[in-house]
Amino acid sequence: MYTYKAKLDRIVDGDTLDAKIDLGFDITVHKRIRLAGINTPESRTRDKEEKKRGLAAKDALTVMLEGDNVNNYFILESESVGKFGRVLGRLHIKTKEGEYCINDQLVKNGHAVEYHGGKR
């Protein structure tokens, strides 16, 4: 397991984002991150109900990373890259109430379900 500081570039959907990852020694890379262990509804679909839930998940992720976050960064824990070339990771942030894992919070709030690969 590797741990990095990262800053948000852009939120793609409820379980995917682009970020600038600090590798140390003033070396940074811009990568797409897929939140590991969870799956959110798709926000780019013709199914209007799924799209509505997908946009709600994206909004929840936005609030956590941009609104609740007291630092300008989050902590990325990652051990691998997925089959589509995205970094698979768990995100942690610090808020006024304490620290928490974004992946777990999305599941707890009903915006995501646990997912560990395979058929959805």
Language-model segments: residues:
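Small beta-barrel nucleic-acid-binding modules, primarily SNase/OB-fold domains
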Residues: 1-120
